[in-house]
Each structure stands twice: as structure tokens, then as C-alpha cells.
Amino acid sequence: MSVASAVLRVETWLLATWHVKVPPMWLEACVNWIQEENNNATLSQAQINKQVLEQWLLTDLRDLEHPLLPDDILELPKGELNGFYALQINSLVDVSQPAYSQIQKLRGKNTTNDLVSAETQSTPKPWEVRPSRMLMLQLTDGVTHIQGMEYQSIPALHSGLPPGTKILVRGCILFRLGVLLLKPENVKVLGGEVDGLSEENAQEKVLARLIGELDPTVPVIPNNSIHNVPKVSGGLDAVLGPSDEELLASLDESEESAANNDVAMERSCFSTGTSSNTTPTNPSGFEPGCNISSRPKEKPPNQPTHFTDGEFDDFSLEEALLLEETVQKEQMETKASQPLTLKENTGKCMEIFSHKPSSLNHTALIHKQGNSNFDEKTSEQMIHEDKFFDCASTRNHHKRFSAHDFTNDSKISEVDDAAQQTLSSSNVHCLRNKILNRKLDLSEKSSQISKENGHPFQACSSRSFENNTYLSIGMDLHSPPFIYLSVLMARKPKEVTTVTVKAFIVTLTGNLSSSGGFWGVTAKVSDGTAYLDVDFIDEILTSMIGYSVPEMKQLRKDPLKYKTFLEGLQKCQRDLIDLCCLMTISYDPSSCKGVVLELQDVGMEHVENLKKRLNK
């Protein structure tokens, strides 16, 4: 008997006996495999039919990708389904009973109120209808996913059916909004199961997802409010900082508050980002005794990553350091976008232009004076498993931190005092008047720049852009002491250009990584007029951390010395949080990105240069 004739007979038998339709390619591969498994021995047609059916029952229909249901069944609000359809049960749950009580029974926990003597609810009367079971099934033909509801009690179904069980849906079936209303005469259980689904959609896991429990195989991320994080005083805990769970838990809160502030405040800068998720399509292939092709399982988020000494040539510090994600609501106030315009902004002006540096030389960070008291919660796994903090963060130079963040309430008052000592009020008023007297209609210009330079530059609101552009009239790209990103955006340089801007880190767009023996991290910076994606070079990060990548590898061999490396990471975290300085950036118009080559503290010479530029 030839393979082609055997395949044709099996296809006819499956359709006539079981109303099962399968792809011809899969059927041919299955018959060939059966013959190979039997050493090409002569098998009767009945034996081939039986083994093909067994293989189909163990196959995940999603891998076959052979549509059976009507294409528009999910689009119609209601209708009737007629005919025979062999479908697969991905999961099922009894929706007539609370999911919590069901999962407690599965776990063998006693939920009866034995200690409660009072009558908690009225006893049902004998004539009252008792609640009956109602199963909700997640069904698929391999392409279309639809729900099936136990409209009437179906004895053939029960909650113990393994995920991947095949059923035959037949007859005239009503459906409403993508839900089949199943009756006993509409369902016939064919059997089978799918190994992958048996673990993924086990009854306990399905119920746990319904009540909001996290998968025990995935690290738990507590939903801690930034106001309710307990304080830890002294010791190593205060040095290592908050755990990666806290950083990730607070990420959504800080992003939510930032989004609300962007909508509410007209002068605040805005930025948008998009992310795309791609799902690989598994090719149809045949594997004996199981699914046609194994479906790849997604790696749970925040899975701990362990590194060996030889794995640091190119690694991502998955749990790693960098910026604190427990920043409270962003304070994008008018003061930050309108320097030198109001009397109360005197201190802010001088915080920008006359901040006292720890060194007048080119340095890799800004050292700020004052009491910096921080109380942080520590992840114990960081010591034993060499894990790091996640590095995503948002940062504004005037943000306020909660109790367990880095708090330094004396900074503003200290800088205000320094500002008042440096510039007299008359000079401030003089500068303010000169700025306000330069009238230029910039709304059209700002909108044009925003459209033409949408990425990676992202323009601020028109009023913020207008106020910041008062200082940039007649400014070239090398005008001392610094220029604005909006000016660089407007000039549209054709070649790689090196400029100096006074900016701060808004957020890190990548993890701290080590590649080829060099540190690297990507970030989004802003000077209040626009945003720019940049890379920080190894020299800057090495200066902040205190150790190069080769030195870090040596420190890992000694637990005591490795502790100092972790302290260096924490120091780098604090420095990046407070980072607001002059940045020398090499901007490449072809890639629309920049490279931060140097960080420099603001000195008095920069203030004098700024005065000269304003007096022109």
C-alpha cells in the first residue's frame, strides 16, 4: 500500500467517523512516522487509522493552525453554529462557585467557620433551587479562540478534564458575543491531552489567575505604596538600597504620576514611546507521541539571572543598579521651564548657573553638599546571588523624594542662599527685563521644529519652548557657556557635531551593561527645551562606579572586596539621581543620537559667560 493511498483513506475515515479535519501535510508526515516506527512493516489500514487518531488527540491544535470555525463568528453579536467541529479545550473553570473556595479545596485547606456559632446566612428552603454547576470552556480550532458555556448540565464534562482534551461540537448551537451556549446533545468528548497545556493551564493555576494570585514560579512584585515602605536604619541594608521588586513596583506609579502631570501642566515637557511585541510563529512539523511542535514558553519577567566569571564579557545587569524607581510625583513646575522670569525663581536661576562645584576641573559627576539621609529596603538576594537593581528610572532635577528615597531638603535652601550671595536682586531684575523685552513669535517655529525633528528629539510644549528660546536668539552651536537642545534641533547639522548643554537625566533607556571590557548605558537627557537619546562612555561610568570592568571581575573573586564594588554601584546610583551639569555631547545626525563625552560642574566662569551673552 502506497503512502498516498493510505493518507487518503485515513483522511476519509477521520472525517466520516469522527468528523475530524487535519492538514494534508501533517497527515502525510504522521503516516510516514508511523511506518518508520514500525520498521516499515506492513500495517493494516485499521491500525494506521487508530495510531493517527491517537497522535491527533495528543497534538496541540494551535500548532496545526488549521481553521475550522467560521471566520466571522467572533464578529457577529449572535447567531447559530451548525455542523460538526472538532475543537480543543485549552482550559475550563466552574463559574458557578467562587474561585477562592475552589482553590482552597484543591489545596486541602479547611475554610469552614467552625469557631463561628452565629448563623452567617439563611438556610435554603427545600423547595429553593440549589446552584448548579456552570463550566466555562476556552475552546480553539487552532486558529480561532472562542468560549463555550455549559448552558445546560452536560454529564460528559467535568472540571477534571485535562487541558488539551478534544471535543466534538455538533448540531445547532446558539452563540452570543463569542460564547457558544452548549447543551448535552451538542458535546461529545473525544479524549486526549496536551503536555504543555497540562502544566500551563492546570486547574489550580487557572483559579489562581482568576483571584489575582501570581504564579509561584515568577518572583512576587509587591504593590507597595511609596509612602508605606518601611525604613531600615544603618548597616549594610542602607548601603545596598531598595530591592529590585520595590523599584519595579514603583515604576508604574511614577510613570502614572508623570503622565498626569504632563497632561495637567501646560509648561511641562512631554515624551512618547512605543514598544512592539513580536510573537514567533511555529512551523508545522511532526514529532511522535506528543505535540507537532513544541510552543516556546515565554521567560517569566524579572527571572533571576546568575553569572559566572566567564560570562561578564557581554552581560546585562538584569537586576542591576542605576536609578531609583521610587520617585514621587514629578514636580514639573513653571519654575523649571521659565528661568530668570520671576522673583521667586532667583534661587532656581542660580541653581542652574552658579552651582558651586566640588572641582573646577572636568569631572565625572557633581558633588552636592548637605545632609543626605536615605532609608532603603534591601534585597537579601543581592549579596548571595550577585544580583543588581533594574536601571530604568525617571529623573527631574527638582523632584522630591519620599521617606525611603534620597532626601535632601537642605539643598534648595542652600543653593538659594548661594544664589543670593552671587547675584544681587538688581542684576536679576535687569536680566529678567531683558529677556521679557525680547519679543518673538515662536509658536509657529516650535511646532515646525517638533514636527521635523520628532525623534529622538522631542519638543516641549509651545510655551515652555518659547520661554527657553528667548535665551537662544542669535546663538551658534558653540556659544559659551552652553547651548540648548532646541537650537541644535533647529540647526539640523549635517555632520557629527560636538556641543555643550546643561542637562539632566530624564530616564535610563537601557540597563547598565558590560561589553568588550567597557561599561555602557543609554539614557534620555533633557535641558528643558527638548529631549535627546544618548550613550555614556566608559570613562564617565568608571569614574562614577569607581571600578572598571576588569577590576570588577577581579573583585568578584573576593566576597569582601566585592562588597566595595556594590557600594560603588550604589554611589553611581546617587550620582545619577542628582546629575545636572554641563554635558559635552557628540551628536550624530545620521543615527539621531548623542554620546556624552564629558561631564563638567558649573562654575563662576560659566555664569560670567552667560551674563555676557545676555548683555549683547
Curated annotation (Swiss-Prot):
Ubl conjugation listed as a keyword: yes
Keywords per UniProt: Acetylation, DNA replication, Isopeptide bond, Nucleus, Phosphoprotein, Ubl conjugation
Cross-link Glycyl lysine isopeptide (Lys-Gly) (interchain with G-Cter in SUMO2) placement: K335, K387
Family statement: Belongs to the RMI1 family.
Pfam families found in the cross-reference section: RMI1_C (PF16099), RMI1_N_C (PF08585), RMI1_N_N (PF21000)
An annotated GO BP: response to glucose
Chain positions found as N-acetylmethionine: M1
Organism: Mus musculus
Function description: Essential component of the RMI complex, a complex that plays an important role in the processing of homologous recombination intermediates to limit DNA crossover formation in cells. Promotes TOP3A binding to double Holliday junctions (DHJ) and hence stimulates TOP3A-mediated dissolution. Required for BLM phosphorylation during mitosis. Within the BLM complex, required for BLM and TOP3A stability.
Disulfide bonds: none
InterPro entries: RMI1_C, RMI1_N, RMI1_N_C_sf, RMI1_N_N_sf, RMI1_OB
Protein name in the entry: RecQ-mediated genome instability protein 1
Keyword Methyltransferase assigned: no
Gene name of the encoded protein: Rmi1
Modified-residue entries (Phosphoserine), positions: S225, S293
Subcellular location: Nucleus
Domain of life: Eukaryota
